[in-house]
């Protein structure tokens, strides 16, 4: 029972991620489904559910597969097969698909997959002799689910989007569930602090701290962060630049642009964390946040609680088109050291905002202020939940200086 990385419309027209109920015969490799009936009890909807299926839904589907089976993976897809009853049924779901891989001796006693206990007694009454857990081979997940089934569920006109970027855990060396929890909590606190109410858009904030992620590096790092957009504008986040020069370029483009301020500011490059909807968030990040309990700031208004405020961390490279060619904007995911910078900056900004110290807007927007010293915990590189304390020196540089910082 797998939660697919795709969006479809539910009966109310709202986007939902569907669930696939896929039956595989281990004797002959057939992918089995059923002829859907016209009632819930006869597997109305077939092998796709628009919400997480209950044990009762899965049981109804399995009964229908036994009595009205069809084969999916053949040249005659949808071909009706003779009714049959298996001796053994092994279950897995999205959260348990990788559990105990290569540890077959643990499968029979594992109860983490809810469908084992939820269907066991009813299946026994039908004559199914064994019902227990078994993980899903990674190659099956990648080749069949990811490579074949999910692409077939995407709308024909769907363009490439940020939801198809690789997940942070999947593409960033050193990114652990513990660091994800700390990073997402810091991002959620940043949203709740509403920094755009106290700080002008793209106004550079200087951060200096000593790197603790790598023992072989003891240098101090300086980088420049700034608030991007606002809730009222409908686009909001945080950007990081390596030097004051590029941070100032983004600031000037933001405030002297021709109305396309966000696109203009992006032309200055850098790294950004924009807060977006769950529908635009990489599927792997969404699944990991759900699996490991990463925090998302509550949505505003009538939106579902976890629909908005998802942090999307990207490195931006903007290339201006020449000779009439179209401008291009490429997105990649930051490295662990760069993500740690976001984690620490979020925590530093929130502490100073909550204390009423960090303000820069209006006539005083170009004035220098600080420095302030803030101590923050980082979980970058953590595998067992341990953290390290980092001392941040935070200041508002005067916006007339050509000082540049260094960033690793």
Q: Model regions: which residues?
A:
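Secondary-structure boundary/capping micro-motif
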Residues: 1-408
């Amino acid at each position: 029972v797998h939660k697919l990385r795709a969006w479809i419309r539910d009966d109310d027209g709202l986007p939902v991620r569907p669930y696939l109920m896929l039956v595989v015969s281990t004797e002959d490799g057939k992918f089995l489904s059923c002829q859907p009936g016209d009632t819930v009890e006869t597997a109305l909807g077939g092998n796709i559910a628009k919400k997480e299926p209950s044990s009762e839904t899965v049981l109804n589907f399995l009964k229908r597969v036994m009595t009205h089976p069809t084969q999916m993976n053949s040249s005659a897809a949808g071909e009706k097969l003779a009714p049959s009853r298996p001796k053994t049924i092994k279950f897995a779901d999205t959260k348990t698909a990788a559990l105990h891989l290569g540890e077959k001796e643990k499968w029979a006693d594992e109860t983490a997959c809810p469908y084992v206990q939820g269907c066991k007694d009813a299946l026994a009454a039908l004559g199914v002799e064994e019902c227990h857990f078994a993980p899903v081979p990674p190659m099956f997940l990648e080749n069949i689910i990811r490579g074949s089934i999910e692409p077939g569920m995407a709308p024909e006109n769907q363009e490439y989007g940020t939801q198809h970027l690789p997940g942070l855990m999947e593409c960033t060396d050193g990114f652990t569930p513990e660091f994800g929890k700390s990073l997402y909590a810091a991002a959620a606190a940043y949203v709740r602090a509403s920094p755009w109410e106290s700080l002008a858009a793209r106004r550079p904030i200087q951060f200096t701290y000593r790197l603790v992620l790598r023992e072989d590096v003891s240098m101090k790092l300086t980088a420049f962060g700034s608030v991007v957009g606002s809730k009222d504008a409908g686009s909001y986040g945080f950007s990081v630049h390596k030097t004051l020069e590029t941070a100032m370029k983004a600031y000037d483009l933001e405030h002297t642009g021709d109305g396309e301020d966000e696109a203009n500011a992006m032309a200055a490059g850098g790294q950004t964390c924009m807060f977006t909807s769950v529908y635009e968030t990489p599927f792997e990040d969404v699944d990991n946040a759900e699996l490991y309990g990463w925090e998302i700031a509550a949505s505003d208004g009538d939106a579902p609680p976890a629909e908005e405020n998802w942090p999307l961390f990207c490195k931006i490279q903007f290339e201006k088109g020449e000779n009439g060619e179209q401008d291009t904007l490429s997105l990649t995911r930051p490295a662990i050291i760069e993500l740690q910078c976001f984690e620490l900056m979020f925590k530093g900004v929130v502490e100073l905002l909550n204390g009423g110290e960090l303000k820069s807007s209006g006539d005083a927007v170009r004035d220098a202020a600080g420095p302030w010293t803030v101590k923050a915990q980082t979980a970058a590189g953590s595998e067992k939940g341990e953290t390290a304390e980092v001392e941040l020196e935070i200041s508002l540089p005067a916006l007339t200086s050509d000082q540049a910082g260094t960033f690793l």
